[in-house]
UniProtKB/Swiss-Prot annotation:
Keywords noted in UniProt: Early protein, Host cytoplasm, Host nucleus, Host-virus interaction, Inhibition of host adaptive immune response by virus, Inhibition of host TAP by virus, Viral immunoevasion
Complex formation: Interacts with host TAP1 and TAP2; these interactions inhibit the loading of peptides onto MHC class I molecules.
Protein name: ICP47 protein
GO biological process: symbiont-mediated suppression of host antigen processing and presentation
Comment text on domains: The N-terminal active domain blocks peptide binding to and peptide transport by TAP.
Statement: the UniProt record of this protein carries the keyword Acetylation: no
GO cellular component: host cell cytoplasm; host cell nucleus
Source species of the chain: Cercopithecine herpesvirus 16
Biased segments, Basic and acidic residues type: 38-50
Chief localisation class: host cell
Pfam family of the protein (one): Herpes_US12
Length: 78
């Protein structure tokens, strides 16, 4: 959650008077913050030069069995 979003909620809850704001007003502002964050996230995800996830690496070659000396360690007992 964005710090702006949390700051807005905190200001609303901590204020002795809500400055004539209603819950509907607060909800409208918070929805606007959330929409803006979604738009920014969509831009970041779709950015071709700066992808959020690295491209997948090549999967290991499973056509050949592993050498005999590379067995997995035994599972730890509880």
């Amino acid at each position: 959650m964005s710090s702006l979003y949390l700051a807005e909620v905190d200001a609303f809850l901590q204020s002795p008077r809500t400055r004539h704001r209603t819950c509907a007003d607060l909800r409208r502002e918070l929805d606007a913050y959330a929409d803006e964050e979604r738009r920014e996230a969509a831009k970041a995800i779709a950015h071709p030069d700066r992808p959020l996830l690295a491209p997948p690496s090549a999967p290991p070659d499973r056509s050949r069995p592993a050498p005999r000396g590379t067995a997995h360690p035994p599972a730890a007992s509880p």
